[in-house]
């Protein structure tokens, strides 16, 4: 009895198909670009705001704030594969949810940096593998004949292509993590305050704030006839499709559906409704048809619609920009040159750099006390101020920025702490140019001079005193000698009873008057 062959036989075509795709990638290389799905003519550029009929008072874009930063949260993207039925036909594809898109999502130029300037085309695999993409899809539209990137393209903070204000649906992420969807003026694209770090252009805004927005997009982006038919046909024809958007949690959404123009796949209405049911809030349509490609971990994971050079096989098309999901990266990757990127978050290396990108100078709550400028080395104080936070006025004898200059005033005049001008109207006095207080050598010199002056003064006073004493001594001696050489008067002692005094008195009278009777 023969062994059952059913399950094994069903695997053979699938394996052959995968081998065929792999062989095409390795051997045949370039596709024939035969599944074209173009929204506009190739030869005509539309002017800015062409046919725009925006409702009065309604903003032309939606901004979604970034989710709260959670360094410990998982950054793994969730890829879901679906096979769903639309109008009785089965459609297979992928829907990817990406957490923390500011750090895990990038718009890549074809073949790497410089691809748009050089008008290169490359397969999604060739662009995604060197960039380390875990998940990658084709991105924006391009000119098939020249490879020119169309619309706005900002790749990792670099504006590499500008639409000049041409109105097509845009999807971008600003430096602070805000997700922007909709229509942008040229000034908004070039905004220097909160610039875009990732931005690309699509065609047709599929979902706006949870509602399908295709009709409004057709009015804004115009209905023009082109090589593959009208803009209406571009919207309504079934084909392979790709899209990018976000959900209510701020997660980025990538959508891919296999198909072939007019044979299998989805139209834009079906894709928009499918995304709306997946809680997508805003989304735009990206390049589809033969460009639609999905790469997982560096390997083609979709079924291209373009034929290889050998019509037996299908080959991925060489496209333009690529949307890439990678391991968490810092924005900017070098943390503005002031930090180290660790698991998608910048750890600032300086004491004064702060912020998600280490790009904000912070010198503390006092902010240099409004008397200085905060720099990466701390506060640089204005003239007349000093201290770590510029809160102290210059000490006496110093002036200028940070009080680094000594005053040059003479005669102890005042010195302006800001300009250094000498003015007698100032209350404070200038000190010596070198220091605000005398140095040890100056103190020693001052002490020696003082003691010398005091010593000389004392010696002088001592000499004067000695001279005066000698003069007095000599004068006293001369007076004494004069009394010894001349007459003297005898004064007898007085008796107690007075008799001797009377007799002596009478004797003296007789002696003094010899002519008395």
From Swiss-Prot:
<comment type="subunit">
    <text>Homotetramer arranged as two disulfide-linked homodimers. Interacts with AP4M1.</text>
</comment>
<feature type="glycosylation site" description="N-linked (GlcNAc...) asparagine">
    <location>
        <position position="297"/>
    </location>
</feature>
<keyword id="KW-0812">Transmembrane</keyword>
<dbReference type="InterPro" id="IPR018711">
    <property type="entry name" value="NAGPA"/>
</dbReference>
<feature type="disulfide bond">
    <location>
        <begin position="133"/>
        <end position="324"/>
    </location>
</feature>
<feature type="glycosylation site" description="N-linked (GlcNAc...) asparagine">
    <location>
        <position position="367"/>
    </location>
</feature>
<keyword id="KW-0732">Signal</keyword>
<dbReference type="GO" id="GO:0032580">
    <property type="term" value="C:Golgi cisterna membrane"/>
</dbReference>
<keyword id="KW-0472">Membrane</keyword>
<feature type="topological domain" description="Lumenal">
    <location>
        <begin position="50"/>
        <end position="453"/>
    </location>
</feature>
<feature type="glycosylation site" description="N-linked (GlcNAc...) asparagine">
    <location>
        <position position="421"/>
    </location>
</feature>
<comment type="function">
    <text>Catalyzes the second step in the formation of the mannose 6-phosphate targeting signal on lysosomal enzyme oligosaccharides by removing GlcNAc residues from GlcNAc-alpha-P-mannose moieties, which are formed in the first step. Also hydrolyzes UDP-GlcNAc, a sugar donor for Golgi N-acetylglucosaminyltransferases.</text>
</comment>
<keyword id="KW-0378">Hydrolase</keyword>
<feature type="disulfide bond">
    <location>
        <begin position="116"/>
        <end position="149"/>
    </location>
</feature>
<feature type="domain" description="EGF-like">
    <location>
        <begin position="359"/>
        <end position="391"/>
    </location>
</feature>
<dbReference type="Pfam" id="PF09992">
    <property type="entry name" value="NAGPA"/>
</dbReference>
<feature type="disulfide bond">
    <location>
        <begin position="381"/>
        <end position="390"/>
    </location>
</feature>
<feature type="glycosylation site" description="N-linked (GlcNAc...) asparagine">
    <location>
        <position position="215"/>
    </location>
</feature>
<dbReference type="GO" id="GO:0033299">
    <property type="term" value="P:secretion of lysosomal enzymes"/>
</dbReference>
<dbReference type="Pfam" id="PF23106">
    <property type="entry name" value="EGF_Teneurin"/>
</dbReference>
<keyword id="KW-0865">Zymogen</keyword>
<feature type="propeptide" description="Removed in mature form">
    <location>
        <begin position="26"/>
        <end position="49"/>
    </location>
</feature>
<protein>
    <recommendedName>
        <fullName>N-acetylglucosamine-1-phosphodiester alpha-N-acetylglucosaminidase</fullName>
        <ecNumber>3.1.4.45</ecNumber>
    </recommendedName>
</protein>
<feature type="glycosylation site" description="N-linked (GlcNAc...) asparagine">
    <location>
        <position position="389"/>
    </location>
</feature>
<feature type="topological domain" description="Cytoplasmic">
    <location>
        <begin position="475"/>
        <end position="517"/>
    </location>
</feature>
<dbReference type="InterPro" id="IPR000742">
    <property type="entry name" value="EGF-like_dom"/>
</dbReference>
<feature type="signal peptide">
    <location>
        <begin position="1"/>
        <end position="25"/>
    </location>
</feature>
<feature type="transmembrane region" description="Helical">
    <location>
        <begin position="454"/>
        <end position="474"/>
    </location>
</feature>
<feature type="disulfide bond">
    <location>
        <begin position="308"/>
        <end position="315"/>
    </location>
</feature>
<feature type="region of interest" description="Disordered">
    <location>
        <begin position="49"/>
        <end position="75"/>
    </location>
</feature>
<comment type="pathway">
    <text>Protein modification; protein glycosylation.</text>
</comment>
<dbReference type="GO" id="GO:0006486">
    <property type="term" value="P:protein glycosylation"/>
</dbReference>
<dbReference type="GO" id="GO:0003944">
    <property type="term" value="F:N-acetylglucosamine-1-phosphodiester alpha-N-acetylglucosaminidase activity"/>
</dbReference>
<feature type="short sequence motif" description="NPF internalization motif">
    <location>
        <begin position="511"/>
        <end position="515"/>
    </location>
</feature>
<keyword id="KW-1133">Transmembrane helix</keyword>
<feature type="disulfide bond">
    <location>
        <begin position="363"/>
        <end position="374"/>
    </location>
</feature>
<keyword id="KW-0333">Golgi apparatus</keyword>
<keyword id="KW-1015">Disulfide bond</keyword>
<keyword id="KW-0325">Glycoprotein</keyword>
<feature type="region of interest" description="Mediates the interaction with AP4M1">
    <location>
        <begin position="488"/>
        <end position="495"/>
    </location>
</feature>
<keyword id="KW-0245">EGF-like domain</keyword>
<feature type="short sequence motif" description="Tyrosine-based internalization motif">
    <location>
        <begin position="488"/>
        <end position="491"/>
    </location>
</feature>
């Amino acid at each position: 009895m023969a062994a059952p062959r059913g399950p094994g036989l069903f695997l053979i075509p699938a394996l052959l198909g995968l081998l065929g795709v792999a062989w095409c990638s390795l051997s045949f290389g370039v596709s024939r670009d035969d599944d074209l799905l173009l929204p506009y003519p190739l030869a005509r550029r539309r002017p800015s705001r062409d046919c725009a009929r925006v409702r009065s008072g309604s903003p032309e874009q939606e901004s979604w704030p970034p989710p709260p930063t959670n360094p410990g949260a998982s950054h793994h993207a969730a890829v879901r594969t679906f096979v769903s039925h639309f109008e009785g036909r089965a459609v297979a594809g992928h829907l990817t949810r990406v957490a923390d898109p500011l750090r895990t999502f990038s718009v890549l130029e074809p073949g790497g940096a410089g691809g748009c300037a050089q008008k290169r085309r490359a397969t999604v695999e060739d662009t995604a593998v060197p960039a380390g993409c875990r998940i990658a899809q084709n991105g924006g539209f391009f000119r098939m004949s020249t490879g020119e990137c169309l619309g706005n393209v900002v790749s990792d903070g670099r504006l590499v292509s500008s639409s000049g204000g041409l109105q097509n649906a845009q999807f971008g992420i600003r430096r602070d993590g805000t997700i922007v969807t909709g229509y942008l003026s040229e000034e908004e694209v070039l905004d220097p305050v909160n610039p875009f770090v990732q931005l690309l252009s699509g065609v047709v805004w599929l979902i706006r704030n949870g509602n399908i927005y295709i009709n409004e997009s057709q009015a804004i982006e115009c209905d023009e006839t082109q090589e593959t038919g009208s803009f209406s046909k571009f919207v309504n024809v079934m084909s392979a499709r790709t899209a990018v958007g976000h959900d209510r949690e701020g997660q980025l959404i990538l959508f891919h559906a296999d198909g072939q123009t007019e044979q299998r796949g989805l139209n834009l209405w079906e894709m928009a409704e499918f995304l709306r049911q997946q809680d997508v809030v805003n989304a735009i349509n990206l390049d589809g048809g033969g460009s639609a490609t999905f790469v997982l971990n560096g390997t083609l994971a979709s079924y291209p619609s373009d034929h290889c050079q050998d019509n037996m096989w299908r080959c991925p098309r060489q496209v333009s920009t690529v949307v890439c999901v990678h391991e968490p990266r810092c924005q900017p990757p070098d943390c503005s040159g002031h930090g180290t990127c660790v698991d998608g978050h910048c750890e600032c290396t300086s004491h004064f750099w702060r912020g998600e990108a280490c790009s904000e100078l912070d010198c503390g709550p006092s902010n240099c006390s409004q008397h200085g400028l905060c720099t990466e080395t701390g506060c640089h104080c204005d003239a007349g101020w000093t201290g770590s936070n510029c809160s102290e006025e210059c000490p006496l004898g110093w002036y200028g920025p940070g009080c680094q200059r000594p005053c040059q005033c003479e005669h102890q005049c005042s010195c302006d702490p800001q300009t250094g001008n000498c003015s007698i109207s100032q209350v404070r006095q200038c000190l010596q140019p070198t220091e605000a207080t005398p140095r040890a050598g100056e103190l020693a010199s001052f002490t020696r001079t003082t003691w010398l002056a005091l010593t000389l003064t004392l010696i002088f006073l001592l000499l004067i005193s000695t001279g005066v004493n000698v003069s007095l001594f000599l004068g006293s001696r001369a007076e004494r000698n004069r009394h010894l050489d001349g007459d003297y008067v005898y004064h007898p002692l007085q008796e107690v009873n007075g008799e001797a005094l009377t007799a002596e008195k009478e004797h003296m009278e007789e002696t003094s008057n010899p002519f008395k009777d």
